[in-house]
A protein has these predicted regions:
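Bacterial N-terminal signal peptides
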Residues: 17-30
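Short substrate-entry loop that stabilizes the transition state in hydrolases
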Residues: 80-91
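Conserved alpha/beta-hydrolase
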Residues: 94-119
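Conserved acidic catalytic loop of the alpha/beta-hydrolase fold
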Residues: 133-151
Length: 237
């Protein structure tokens, strides 16, 4: 009898634990939904700032909630495939820049020389990682000058983890926190590059999405609208 009662008590405790976890999950989903709606209703201000390095005009942009002057500055460093437009996919809740801005950051993005809205470079084999790291340093210096802050946060993705790491290693006095996501852990490989990266194509842009066995984009996983946004902006290499 005692053993049976103990077993029953254990089952009840397990059931109560599951119910509690379910309530927490539902509450979290409700909070996330409310926050997403609030983010969608938020107005943002986008400003561009003139920046030049080595005679090349660089695109530098600041995004923040309209009417605010955030103290926290964060610089987003893009990867090899796309320019900085990848951080502000203005569709549903896909914009990382707007997500961070809604949480109190002044969000800065820039295009490495030859990318996006920065000036084209004559040598398509440039910029390499070292060159791009100094572009990031130039952007950071301008951000600190404009904002009046002494340090900023840096977030780099993919190849941006390489360039932002090199920038931070050379200029640690500028940086408060460094975040690396989807890092390149083994370098860029030993493959010989024979064609300069002067232009991106829709096919190259599509290559970053999940595909089926026959190589087609898997729209059961990927939102078609997001694919359309990226492919329509692939010229911004």
């Amino acid at each position: 009898m005692i053993r049976g009662a103990d077993t029953g008590g254990t089952m009840i405790r397990s059931l109560l634990s599951c119910l509690l976890m379910l309530q927490v999950l539902l509450f979290s989903l409700q909070v996330a939904t409310v926050q997403a709606r609030a983010d969608a209703a938020t107005e943002y201000q986008i400003q561009t700032f003139p920046l030049e390095r080595n005679g090349v005009a660089l695109h530098l942009q600041r995004l923040a909630v309209a009417g605010t002057q955030p103290q926290r500055q964060i610089l987003l460093v893009h990867g090899l495939t796309y320019s900085s437009h990848e951080f502000d996919v203005n569709y549903a809740d896909y914009s990382l820049a707007r997500y961070l801005a809604a949480r109190g950051f002044a969000v800065w993005t820039f295009d490495v020389a030859g990318y996006g809205e920065s000036q084209e470079v004559e040598d398509g084999f440039m910029p390499n990682s070292d060159y791009a790291a100094e572009d990031a340093a130039a952007a950071a210096a301008e951000i600190l000058k404009v904002s009046g802050q002494k340090k900023l946060d840096v977030l780099g993705g993919s190849w941006g983890t390489v360039t932002s790491s090199r920038f931070v290693a050379r200029h640690p006095e500028m940086v408060k926190k460094l975040v690396l996501y989807a890092p390149i852990m083994v370098g860029l490989g030993a493959a010989e590059v024979k064609v300069p990266f002067n232009h991106n194509t829709w096919l190259h842009a599509a290559g970053d999405f999940q595909t089926t066995k026959d190589g087609a984009i898997d729209y059961t996983i990927v939102d078609p609208q997001v694919v359309a946004v990226f492919q329509s902006n692939c010229w911004r290499y």
